[in-house]
Amino acid sequence: MRTLLIVAVLLVGVEGSVYELGKMILQETGKNAATSYGFYGCNCGVGRRGKPKDATDRCCFVHKCCYKKLTDCNSKTDRYSYSWKDKTIVCGDNNPCLQEMCECDKAVAICLRENLNTYNKKYKIHMKFFCKKPDAC
């Protein structure tokens, strides 16, 4: 099952510790990261940038901006640790950059949960050419 989740999240093309981010999104939203957010709107998934279509898409936009602020770590390859305590994500890493990356991922997972009511199936597989120039971070 773990291998399937890793492959699914890799297909989405999310950055960062893909396994942890996929788990966080599943824990917070109950949705599979790959199938629900892999091509959502203009900002969810790798290489996708544009003016957010809704609050759900804005979560992904803010997540990309959060990653741009990271220093001294590689959001595509570095891994961090976190735990799930009392239905709460707890980032726990001694490396400051990995801690920041975990906090970015935690924030997007919570944002996606808080905006489940804005999730629009018509944006689930949204073509990139429909996206307008993105706002600045």
From Swiss-Prot:
The keyword Disulfide bond applies. Keywords: Disulfide bond, Myotoxin, Secreted, Signal, Toxin. It comes from the Eukaryota. GO terms for molecular function: calcium ion binding; calcium-dependent phospholipase A2 activity; phospholipid binding; toxin activity. The record marks 121, 124 as: Important residue of the cationic membrane-docking site (MDoS). Pfam families: Phospholip_A2_1. GO terms for biological process: arachidonate secretion; lipid catabolic process; negative regulation of T cell proliferation; phospholipid metabolic process. It is found in: Secreted. One of its GO terms (cellular component) is extracellular region. Its main location: secreted. Gene3D superfamilies: Phospholipase A2 domain. Expressed by the venom gland. InterPro entries: PLipase_A2, PLipase_A2_Asp_AS, PLipase_A2_dom, PLipase_A2_dom_sf, PLipase_A2_His_AS. The record marks 128, 133 as: Cationic membrane-docking site (MDoS). The record marks 127, 130 as: Hydrophobic membrane-disruption site (MDiS). Disulfide bonds join 42-131, 44-60, 59-111, 65-137, 66-104, 73-97, 91-102. Residues 1-16 form the signal peptide. Residues 121-133 are annotated as: Important for membrane-damaging activities in eukaryotes and bacteria. Belongs to the phospholipase A2 family. Group II subfamily. K49 sub-subfamily. Snake venom phospholipase A2 homolog that lacks enzymatic activity. Is myotoxic. A model of myotoxic mechanism has been proposed: an apo Lys49-PLA2 is activated by the entrance of a hydrophobic molecule (e.g. fatty acid) at the hydrophobic channel of the protein leading to a reorientation of a monomer. This reorientation causes a transition between 'inactive' to 'active' states, causing alignment of C-terminal and membrane-docking sites (MDoS) side-by-side and putting the membrane-disruption sites (MDiS) in the same plane, exposed to solvent and in a symmetric position for both monomers. This is Basic phospholipase A2 homolog Pgo-K49. It comes from Cerrophidion godmani (Porthidium godmani). The lineage of its organism: Eukaryota, Metazoa, Chordata, Craniata, Vertebrata.
